[in-house]
Amino acid sequence: MSLSFLLLLFLSHLILSAWAHGEKHLAPKGQPGPAATGRNPAGASSSRSSRGTTSSSSSSVSSSHSASLGNQGSGLEQSSFQWSPSGRRTGSLYCRVGIGFHLQIYPDGKVNGSHEANMLSILEIFAVSQGIVGIRGVFSNKFLAMSKKGKLHASAKFTDDCKFRERFQENSYNTYASAIHRTEPAGREWYVALNKRGKAKRGCSPRVKPQHISTHFLPRFKQLEQPELSFTVTVPEKKKPPSPVKPKVPLSAPRKSPNTVKYRLKFRFG
């Protein structure tokens, strides 16, 4: 009885080990067994859902970030400078017509000339592109513009009407012509000009020519005062060579000569 019982135990042990070994071979690699999968099915589903939510949240964050970057880019384009800050020159434009006038821009949009320079005649000329400049009144904070009818006025915003072509003449004066407005059939340019009374001329007038002094302006810009360069030169003093020291000779007492001669004065009267 004991031997048969032991044989049964041994056979059952072999059968159980073979069955367990077969299950291990049947299960594919990288997948948990039935015990592992059956332990917490809810946990697996929750992990999958959490992964899905994290991926969706990351995609939403990336999309919102890209949208914010796009909004920032458009905002930067909208908030960019309306005129180029390069090549700024601050001063006045002097026209030598009549008694001489300084071009000035008023806050209410009026443009004319004044014989005496004042705060309204302080202008800022800045470069827009090659050969194209803009003129802004420092006090009025408005831009010089020319309408499609050739009238000079001041504009609060910098537009294409505010662009002028700057040319240097042979007499060291400058002319300023509208960059977009001109006489279409002949292609004649419209220039900024003042008359003898200091009033602004229409650029479309046939009398406004680049050869006339009414279109010639002399830029008067403030030049920075150069600091005075001063320096001191120290010349080394030449030291006099020391005089040779004379040897001290002991002074001897004067000796009285033994043969002394005395003379007596004799006075003779009469």
Swiss-Prot record:
GO process terms (BP): fibroblast growth factor receptor signaling pathway; neurogenesis; positive regulation of cell division; positive regulation of cell population proliferation; positive regulation of MAPK cascade; regulation of cell migration
Entry's family note: Belongs to the heparin-binding growth factors family.
Phenotype when changing T159P: Associated with long-haired phenotype
Keywords: Glycoprotein, Growth factor, Mitogen, Secreted, Signal
Compositionally biased region (Polar residues): 69-83
One term under GO cellular component: cytoplasm
Localization of this protein: Secreted
Coiled coil: none
Function: Plays an important role in the regulation of cell proliferation and cell differentiation. Required for normal regulation of the hair growth cycle. Functions as an inhibitor of hair elongation by promoting progression from anagen, the growth phase of the hair follicle, into catagen the apoptosis-induced regression phase.
Signal peptide: 1-20
An example molecular function term from Gene Ontology annotations: growth factor activity
InterPro entries: Fibroblast_GF_fam, IL1/FGF
Glycan-linked positions: N112
Gene, per the UniProt record: FGF5
Name of the protein in question: Fibroblast growth factor 5
Subunit comment: Interacts with FGFR1 and FGFR2. Affinity between fibroblast growth factors (FGFs) and their receptors is increased by heparan sulfate glycosaminoglycans that function as coreceptors.
Disulfide bonds: none
Pfam name, any one: FGF
Keyword Glycoprotein: yes
PANTHER family listed in its UniProt record: FIBROBLAST GROWTH FACTOR
Biased composition (Low complexity): 43-68
